Amino acid sequence: MKQVVVLSLILSFFLFFSCDKKTKIEKAVEAIPVQIKVNRFDKAFFETAPQDLPKLKQEYPFFFPAGNDDSVWLEKMQHPQWRELYTEVEKLYANFDGKTAEIEALFKHIKYYFPETKTPKVYTVISEMDYHNKVIYTKEMLIISLELYLGSKHRFYDFPAYITQNFESNQILPDIASSFATTKVTPPNDLTFLAQMIYVGKELYLKDQLLPETSDADKIGYTKEQLMWCQENEGYIWRYFIENKMLYDSDQKLIPRFINPAPFSKFYLEIDNETPGRIGTWIGWQIARSFMENNKVSLNDFLKMDAKEIFEKSKYKPKK
């Protein structure tokens, strides 16, 4: 009985210490001055009269690349399908204040961990539905393509379900964090499956720090059911990777099977259709988390570390 009490006290102490540490971080984050102004280029473009196009081009020169005749932009401004798309965007995003506040909170977290980061100019656009570039982040600019956040079932989308499931409004923030993360996590020269898993795992661990209020499902872009499947089958997945000697395998076919976006992961077993895509990404995330739980290393140092060292010091051991 005494042992139970002692263990409970120890557990309570660590939980208190962990929560207290998080509270201190969040208080420090809140105190960081960040002011985001979202420039609604989508509104400006579709609400500008054709005769005022020259003024718009002066205000937003970077959205009008040289070589395109004005007739291209005038056609887009007035085309019924483009205008219908703008109407659909306006139904959801006429007021962007809520998202602006969320973006400010994200950049406060970014500046807490990376103080040298400049606050970018933020622009919303309606583009060509390039789902590979839903968000574009540079040191100076952040561009959000709102036509790709109309809801997974929107009638305008003609893409596979595993892609459109992340066309929801709640994916805007995780997508911004992902775009930022690619500037802080360097792709490894090591081509092993383990190194590739930990590379994407680092990005997700960074999202843990930048988006503390965001669910794990939203951070990785899974449904709740897909996340639950990973959690319930973590031991099985890991055993499969070990038994098939995949960790130090440099076969690049493992990347599309287990890391790249896909409708399901390819174990080449009966369970494949039950699985979400990117199982290897999820495992890499758990290894990253395990390492940071078991080692006193700064976030910046962790992001620069070698995958093999991270794995060996992670003490990663999934539940059976």
Set out the residue ranges of the language-model regions.
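Acidic/His/Gly-enriched intrinsically disordered linker/tail segments
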Residues: 205-267
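Sec-dependent signal peptide recognition
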Residues: 2-10
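Extracytoplasmic/secreted envelope proteins and their assembly/folding machinery
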Residues: 38, 104-107, 203, 207, ...
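C-terminal soluble interaction/assembly domains
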Residues: 251-320
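Acidic/His-rich structured neighborhood in mature extracellular/periplasmic domains
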Residues: 82-230, 300, 304-307
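Sec-exported extracytoplasmic/periplasmic mature domains
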Residues: 46, 61, 65, 111-115, ...
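C-terminal motif of bacterial Sec signal peptides marking the signal peptidase cleavage site
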Residues: 15-18
